[in-house]
Amino acid sequence: MLSPKRTKFRKMQKGNNRGLAMTGSDVSFGDFALQCVEPARVTSRQIEAARMAIQRHVKRAGKLWIRIFPDRPVTKKPLEVRMGGGKGAPEEWCALVQPGRVMYEISGVSEETAKEAFRLASHKLPMQCKFLARGLT
């Protein structure tokens, strides 16, 4: 699973996820891309599950780029613990994704293969996604 090697602080505030993605919203590396349509908090497990779904479909063909990284810790208190007593321990890592953000890119495969691979991957992600091709945004 993806996670930062080290961080300045162990815990982070929840914050909000409003607005559109200003950067990272176009196809930069590959020929085809998977772009999110709604805001979400994507965990490292979901990123990895979607990556595995794409790789399983394209087999050894093509090159895949992951354009998001889980850099925010999500904390959780233990089960059956009363409120109070401070913030819980870091449980997992997530990435905040805004609408328009490109999450995965692929090259070296046909458009039909890329479209089907991204369709399989989008079922593993907690938001709606759309397919992009280079030059057609």
Swiss-Prot record:
SUPFAM superfamilies: Ribosomal protein L16p/L10e. Keywords: Ribonucleoprotein, Ribosomal protein, RNA-binding, rRNA-binding, tRNA-binding. InterPro entries: Ribosomal_uL16, Ribosomal_uL16_bact-type, Ribosomal_uL16_CS, Ribosomal_uL16_dom, Ribosomal_uL16_sf. The keyword Lipid metabolism does not apply. One of its GO terms (biological process) is translation. The keyword Zinc does not apply. GO terms for cellular component: cytosolic large ribosomal subunit. It holds the Pfam family Ribosomal_L16. One of its GO terms (molecular function) is tRNA binding. Binds 23S rRNA and is also seen to make contacts with the A and possibly P site tRNAs. Part of the 50S ribosomal subunit. HAMAP family: Ribosomal_uL16 (MF_01342). Belongs to the universal ribosomal protein uL16 family. This is Large ribosomal subunit protein uL16. It comes from Sorangium cellulosum (strain So ce56) (Polyangium cellulosum (strain So ce56)). The gene is rplP.
